[in-house]
From Swiss-Prot:
GO terms for biological process: cell division; mitotic nuclear membrane reassembly; nuclear envelope organization. Pfam families: TB2_DP1_HVA22 (PF03134). The gene is Reep3. One of its GO terms (cellular component) is endoplasmic reticulum membrane. This is Receptor expression-enhancing protein 3. It is found in: Endoplasmic reticulum membrane. PANTHER family: HVA22-LIKE PROTEINS (PTHR12300), RECEPTOR EXPRESSION-ENHANCING PROTEIN 3 (PTHR12300:SF39). The modification Phosphothreonine is found at residue 200. Microtubule-binding protein required to ensure proper cell division and nuclear envelope reassembly by sequestering the endoplasmic reticulum away from chromosomes during mitosis. Probably acts by clearing the endoplasmic reticulum membrane from metaphase chromosomes. Belongs to the DP1 family. It comes from the Eukaryota. It comes from Mus musculus (Mouse). The chain crosses the membrane at residues 1-21, 35-55, 59-79. It is a multi-pass membrane protein.
């Protein structure tokens, strides 16, 4: 674990930060010699990074593996050994020169295929999104239909009172009769009228004016309170439901 931490620190500081700073100075001073030197170093270090990634997964168990990595990075960077320049001129430059045309063709084909693959993936993604939207819409419509079917007729008739007048269905006969009775209530007193069998004589005779109403009630009261019947030459006076017999007074002579 300690060897891994030390090797990682050496690679980051001496393998990346130090060459990056001297590459900046070479670009700033426009020194072609230093510029070529650090360009060769970065090409070799890129290849080293690829090989290191694979070796860390397969050769990390090898004894002194991390110490060898530290020694190799210092050998590449040292101005005395110039390991990066040596590897580039002896191996990389001849290999890249012989395979340059093939590498360029592979790069062009990779760009074209990558563009086509990206377009195909985009179309498939749009198709999947459209299919998912249609499926969700169908499922929601089915849920709404099942919800409406679950309502009973009682629930549907209970909602009819909230509809506009023009859109209400025809009323049943008991509802029409009940509403008709409510409409025939007296507006002055708020008392519903009686049926035809229970109406009094005053109600059956029709409306009167105020004066006629008072006179009519007085006559009816006097007629109901007093009725005279003649039974076998004798008069009986009736006050309401009581009968009062009239006795003859004896005549008094003076």
């Amino acid at each position: 674990m300690v060897s891994w931490m030390i090797s990682r620190a050496v690679v980051l500081v001496f393998g990346m930060l130090y060459p990056a700073y001297y590459s900046y100075k070479a670009v700033k001073t426009k020194n072609v010699k230093e510029y070529v030197r650090w360009m060769m170093y970065w090409i070799v270090f890129a290849l080293y990074t690829v090989i290191e990634t694979v070796a860390d997964q397969t050769l990390a168990w090898f004894p002194l593996y991390y110490e060898l990595k530290i020694a190799f990075v210092i050998w590449l960077l040292s101005p005395y050994t110039r390991g990066a320049s040596l590897i580039y001129r002896k191996f990389l430059h001849p290999l890249l020169s012989s395979k340059e045309r093939e590498i360029d063709d592979y790069i062009v084909q990779a760009k074209e295929r990558g563009y086509e693959t990206m377009v195909n993936f985009g179309r498939q993604g749009l198709n999947l999104a459209a299919a998912a939207a249609v499926t969700a819409a169908v499922k929601s419509q089915g849920a709404i239909t099942e919800r409406l079917r679950s309502f009973s007729m009682h629930d549907l008739t209970a909602i009819q009172g909230d509809e506009p007048v023009g859109h209400r269905p025809y009323q049943t006969l008991p509802e029409a009769k009940r509403k008709g009775k409510q409409a025939t209530e007296s507006p002055a007193y708020g008392i519903p009228l009686k049926d035809g069998s229970e109406q009094t004589d005053e109600e059956a005779e029709g409306p009167f004016s105020d004066d006629e109403m008072v006179t009519h009630k007085a006559l009816r009261r006097s007629q109901s309170m007093k009725s005279v019947k003649t039974i076998k030459g004798r008069k009986e006076v009736r006050y309401g439901s009581l009968k009062y017999k009239v006795k003859k007074r004896p005549q008094v002579y003076f």
